[in-house]
Amino acid sequence: MEARDIILKPLITEKSVAKMSEGKYAFKVRLDANKTQIKQAIEEIFGVTVVRVNTMRVRGKLRRQGKYIGRRSDWKKAIVQLKEGDSIKVFEGL
């Protein structure tokens, strides 16, 4: 699996933007990705040093379309803490 296949997209929320000052960044990742794969992918894509990776599985919400009830897909969130002094340039200015 390539690094760009593991990291699906960055998560930009009010809470994640507040955590960026602490060097913590949030990403949506593949459900089957483990912490080691996530760490290697972030280091390869952004050229930074990862200190810690926390992951959580997020259950999909129930959604209704008229009389039909469906469910969004489950997904995985990764909170990545970088070495002090490192930052990801894409997120700066948020």
Swiss-Prot record:
Entries under Gene3D superfamilies matching the protein: 3.30.70.330
GO molecular function: rRNA binding; structural constituent of ribosome
Signal peptide boundaries: none
InterPro entries assigned to the protein according to its UniProt record, in alphabetical order: Nucleotide-bd_a/b_plait_sf, Ribosomal_uL23-like, Ribosomal_uL23/eL15/eS24_sf
Domain of life from the UniProt record: Bacteria
Single biological process term from Gene Ontology: translation
Keywords: Ribonucleoprotein, Ribosomal protein, RNA-binding, rRNA-binding
Cited SUPFAM superfamilies: Ribosomal proteins S24e, L23 and L15e (SSF54189)
rRNA-binding is among the record's keywords: yes
The keyword Ribonucleoprotein belongs to this UniProt entry's keyword annotation: yes
A GO cellular component entry from the record: ribonucleoprotein complex
PANTHER family linked to this entry: 60S RIBOSOMAL PROTEIN L23A
Similarity field: Belongs to the universal ribosomal protein uL23 family.
Function according to Swiss-Prot or TrEMBL: One of the early assembly proteins it binds 23S rRNA. One of the proteins that surrounds the polypeptide exit tunnel on the outside of the ribosome. Forms the main docking site for trigger factor binding to the ribosome.
Subunit details: Part of the 50S ribosomal subunit. Contacts protein L29, and trigger factor when it is bound to the ribosome.
Protein name per its UniProtKB record: Large ribosomal subunit protein uL23
Source organism (scientific name): Symbiobacterium thermophilum (strain DSM 24528 / JCM 14929 / IAM 14863 / T)
